[in-house]
Amino acid sequence: TGREPETVALRTPKGIVVEVAPLWCCRTDTGAACAIRKDGGDDVDVTTGLPVIASVVLEPDAPGVRIFGGEGVGRVTKPGLDQPVGEAAINHVPRRMIAEALEREAENAAYTGGFAVTISIEGGAETAKRTFNPHIGVEGGLSVLGTSGIVEPMSQQAILDTIQLEMNQAA
């Protein structure tokens, strides 16, 4: 639209629309970038408050949405995770949310080209050292996780899921 938004609306997989105030947004020669602060909800952890940046480049001659991990986003180094070894540790649900949001905006703007999106997390590489990531096979930064688009409080099920993941990798 050419205007810097006061809020950014995100549609979660559960259909809930969440509005957040960006830290900043800017246009570039080839697209735009925007940063938000990670909300930890009821599950405050070492990632709460970190700036998450989405940089989008318009690709008029390339269809679809390509998603990359930038600074502060880890790389998958072991099999058994959501993404293949070598890929950015951005799970399939956040990837789908990003793609769907861009596809909606493209339709609203009558844009028929593609997008290249780079997700970065300020302080992600340093913060990741204080997480499970190095143990489960994510190196160099944080994982972009999620199943519902809403932070759920830490639960026994989350702990069991982590243990199951480690067992799957050991098998």
Task: Briefly describe each language-model feature range.
Residues 1-136:
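Generic N-terminal targeting/processing segments that precede catalytic cores or assembly contacts
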Residues 122, 127-129, 133-171:
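Glycine-rich anion/phosphate-binding loop at the beta-strand->alpha-helix junction
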